[in-house]
Amino acid sequence: MSNEIINRVANSVLITFDLEDLYAPGDRVKVDLSQWLDQGFVLREKEFRTAITSFDWSVYKGCYVALFCSTDAILPAWASLLITAQLNQVANQIVWGSLQDLEHQLFVKAIDELDLSFFESKPVIVKGCSEKQIPESAFVYLTQKLQPVVKSLFYGEACSSVPLFKK
C-alpha cells in the first residue's frame, strides 16, 4: 500500500465557476432625482429641464449609476428618462432603483453574455466565497442558466460542496 497523498480535488474534472470573475470594475454611484425638484417634491418642468441641461454630468464618466428618487414625489415618466438621456452620454450603465438593483443588472448582463457551451454536460461548482459582495440574485440567475446545460451543479468549494442538481 502506498502512503502517497493524492489530491483528488486537483485531479477532478469539476469546473469551478467564480461569479466574482464577472464583476464589472468601476464606481457605483446613486443619483437622487429629488435634488432637481422644488423642495424635493415638485417637478416644475422649465426649471427641471434647465437644471438637467446645465448640470455637469461628466462627474459620472465611466460610472455605473443607480437612479432613484428619495422622496415620495409623484413624477412623470419622462423625468427619469430625461436624466437617463444625459447620463447615457457618460455612464457605463444606468438603472432605476437601488445599488443592489444595479449590481443585479450588471451580473445578469454578464451572465447573458457567457458562452455556456463550455459547460455542456460537465460537472460545475459555483464558488460560494468571494472578496466582492455578490448579490444572491446573481447566484439564482446563474443557476437558472447553467442547469439546462451542465451534467451536475454544486455550490461551495470542491472540498466541501452542496449538490444542487444532477442529470
Language model features: what each stretch is:
Residues 64-70, 95-97, 123-129:
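Short glycine-rich or small-residue beta-strand-to-loop segments that form or flank ligand, phosphate
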Residues 82-87, 138-147:
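Short, non-transmembrane amphipathic alpha-helical segments
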